Amino acid sequence: MDSAEPLTYDQYLATLPDERRESVARVWQVVRDHMPPGYVEEIGPKFLQFATGAEGYVALANQKNYVSLYLLPVYVDPSLKQKLDCVDKKLKVGKSCLNFNHHDDLPLDIIGEIVGTFTPQEFQEKLSRNRTSHRA
């Protein structure tokens, strides 16, 4: 397959190590089930993403030692981060993501809530306000 050709979801899953495939599929299914209408699903050779325009909303990427789930709504609304901070599980938090090896490492119910928070228009407006306030 030409590397410029877009992958299908099943093709993306097939590129993952066996031990990660089920967890990635379970986490991404939660994302899909809670995604508000209007976002576009994009599948690349290294990631899965829902975006609006040029802005990513939620993404999942297979890394060398773990899988990373990027939840951009958390960065435009601090109250959403507080939901993650209150979780009983010890989360592996990166600079802009949650890192995991198995889907059981994650609070999937809270992730679903976070994913479902903003319509594309609401997310774009929040993002724009945040960028404007950081420049001031």
What are these regions, as identified by a protein language model?
Residues 1-136:
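Charge-dense, helix-prone N-terminal extensions
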